[in-house]
Amino acid sequence: DIESNLLNYPEEVFPKPKNADEDLPPVARSFLQQAMDTIHAPDAAAVMAGSAVDAMLKEKGLRKGSLYERIDSALDQNILTQGMADWAHEVRLGSNRPRHADEENPHVTTEQAQQSVDFAEALGNFLFVLTAKIERGIQAAQEEKS
């Protein structure tokens, strides 16, 4: 019967799965979503978080040079603060270890991967999501005046 069958399915998943914000550029959003979805596989999550950061900087027009150079360029252009650039370099280094199979320390911990994912999400919020929300708020206020 249907009622007993429904009892075999969870009503809710805990913790709730996270979704990358729709206001992120598509490539960055895809990488960030993969990072969120693979946090149980820390090396994969760290690599995807690093790729999300890379895609975000490219979306901001920083396409030349290595990711290291692009992070420094973002700092020089005031796209990132010093603290954000420092954290971005940590994410870059963390994603490089599994990506390049570092011989001495190839893996990241779950905590390190989570920090990388958190940074990529925070960077996306700072560079894209907050800006989109502000633009929508301004537009809504202007429409109310009309």
Label each region the model flagged:
Residues 5-11, 61-94:
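Short, charged amphipathic alpha-helical segments flanked by flexible coils
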